[in-house]
Amino acid sequence: MRIGTFNILHGRSPDDGRVDVDRLATAVKSLDCDVLGLQEVDRDQPRSLGADLTAVAADAMGAPEHQFVAALSGTPGGTWMAATGDEQPGSASYGIALLSRYPVVSWRVVRLPPLRASVPLWSTYTRRPFLARDEPRVAVAAVLDGPFGQFTV
C-alpha cells in the first residue's frame, strides 16, 4: 500500500510558474499512490484554467473515490469567504482533497479557524513578501476498506 501527500500549488509548476493540467496528471500518475492527500487544490479557478484539479488527479491515479473539500469560496488572495458546512460552493473554490483507489466507508470533514494574525507570503509577481490575512483551514479524513481491513487516513 502506498500513501502520499502532494501540495499541488493549484496546478502551477515551481519550475516555470505555468499551470499545466496534463503535467499535473503526469506527476500524480508517477507517484503511483493508492491513497493521496492534496493541498492547495483549485476548482473552477481562473488561475488554474477553470479545471477541477481533484478530478484531474483522481483520473490520473485511477482513484474512483475522491472528495474535494473547499476551505474558501472565491479567489485566494482576493475576494473570498469561508466555505461552511458539508456542502461545496457552486463557484470557484480552493481547498484540499483526498483520493483513494480503495472503497470509502465514511468521510469526515473538520473545519478549522484561520490564524488571527496576518501571515507573510511571497509574491511571484512582485518578487517580494507581503502580509495577507490567513485563510480558513480544513481537514478531511476517511475510513477506507483496504486489503487488510478498514483503516483511517
Language-model segments: which ranges?
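Beta-strand-turn-beta hairpins that frame and shape the catalytic cleft
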Residues: 1-3, 96, 100-105, 119-121, ...
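N-terminal, active-site-proximal structural segment of metallo-dependent hydrolase catalytic domains
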Residues: 1-94
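Surface-exposed cleft-lining segments at the edges of enzyme active sites
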Residues: 11-14, 112-131
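Membrane-interface segments of envelope glycosyltransferases acting on lipid-linked substrates or membrane lipids
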Residues: 74-79, 107-108, 115
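A substrate-binding/cap region within the structured catalytic cores of diverse enzymes
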Residues: 84, 94-95, 100, 109-113, ...
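A short catalytic or substrate-binding loop motif that flags glycine-/basic-rich loops and adjacent residues
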Residues: 89-91, 132-136
